[in-house]
Amino acid sequence: MIDRILIIILSVLCLCTFSGSCLAESVTPAPSSEPSISVSTSDEAVGTIADPLEPVNRAFFYINDKLYFWVFKPVATGYKAVIPEDGRIGVHNFFSNVTTPVRLVNCLLQAKFKGAGNETARFALNTTLGIAGFFDPAKKTFKIEKQEADFGQTLGIWGFGPAFYIVWPILGPSNVRDTVGYVGDLSFDPRTYLAYYFVIAEIVNAGTWVLDKLNETSLTLGEYENLKKAALDPYIALREAYSQYRQNKIRK
């Protein structure tokens, strides 16, 4: 399962890089155009991320937008009507607890040893006192905050730049670094190995992924609508918001 995912995503990245290079060679930029298309080795303090695949990205943005309003939002709204907020927060806590190894390993890779210790303590407390992670006594009782750490962030701290912007179908906004980081995080996620070794677990894993995303959507309904309403160009607004969000996570 992991090998298949790696091959598919890395193949797409190679195609994207080749396409971006061809586009860069065929177009002579005007003096006031976007920054030149290049793979940077570090995050830039200011400026817009390169977007050589903008026509393709806009097409995927349009598809994702329609999927959200026609599929995800209606389903999430129905789910929200059936499951009370406390229950949905419990589901969120459960999946957050399951993916503790992702944050723990990345804290270690970033030399944030206190954060790694916090994640270890949180996992122990929430798995036991929190009933398999559905509750979060580590935060509420012991004041131990969850550490936000992922492999895309780790690569940024190591000095790798975002390269250029990518919009993936269903998954949404990303960049080259965060796409590689997403694949890296899959290797730290316990659910990946269950799906790899057990056929039935692969089906269950897909179901848990859908439930996780559905649950998260139900907890954030309205945020995307507000972004679209406030933006002259929602595509650019989302691109800039995502890029700034990721840069801020790396600088923490």
Features from the language model and the residues they span:
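Mid-length scaffold segments of soluble, non-membrane domains
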Residues: 97-176
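N-terminal targeting leaders of membrane proteins
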Residues: 22-113, 200-252
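Positively charged n-region of N-terminal signal peptides that target proteins for export
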Residues: 1-5
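Bacterial N-terminal signal peptides
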Residues: 7-17
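Broad structural signal for hydrophobic residues in well-ordered alpha-helices, predominantly aliphatic
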Residues: 14-15, 79, 138
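Hydrophobic alpha-helical transmembrane segments and adjacent short intramembrane/lumenal linkers
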Residues: 157, 161-166, 173-206
